[in-house]
Amino acid sequence: MFYTYYYTSPIGKITLASNGTHLTGLWMEGQKYFPSHLPADKTTTLLSVFRQTQEWLDAYFKGENPDYLPNIELKDTPFRVAVWEILKHIPYGETVTYKDIAKEVARQNNRQSMSAQAIGGAVGHNPVSIIIPCHRVIGSNGSLTGYAGGIERKIALLKLEGIDTGKFTLPPSKDTKNPLR
């Protein structure tokens, strides 16, 4: 069975997905790579994993750093899952670069190097946004490049965590509104 639940957040409607025991997806409305269709199965009660996720999100959007993760099940290629596991360990209120993650993946696989672009592809397809904090990943030049939920949401999440976004830059095509300040 496949279940969905909708959570209303300060950054818009969020869709949660579960297999009944684990969180399998968390997408913001209009997010890039949002599933084109979700199965029709619905839950008539608030599943335990949805309650756990809702509590996590409630705390997070109050500016708190939840000290646990909901039960999450990640299924994809071994490469993507490895990248998402690394993302889970980026501390609240901190950022890392795609290059940093590439170095860590290379280290874990006894390789000399790894493409930061390949890392970007995996980060961009993270199925559990916010909780697996892909919004904390930036370009090595300080650019807030790429976020499937949109640059404005990435900035809002970083600010919520107390990060000074004024020190970052926007990709050239996104620099019209300057939402960093």
Please provide the spans of the model-predicted regions:
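A sequence-level detector of short linear motifs
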Residues: 15-16, 25, 97, 146
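Nucleic acid-binding interface residues in structured DNA/RNA-binding domains
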Residues: 3-10, 55, 64-181
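Histidine- and/or cysteine-centered catalytic micro-motif in compact active-site loops
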Residues: 12, 28-31, 75
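A generic structural signal for ordered secondary structure
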Residues: 13, 17-19, 47, 119-120, ...
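DNA-contacting interfaces and partner/effector-binding or oligomerization modules
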Residues: 1-24
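Compact structured core domains
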Residues: 18-69
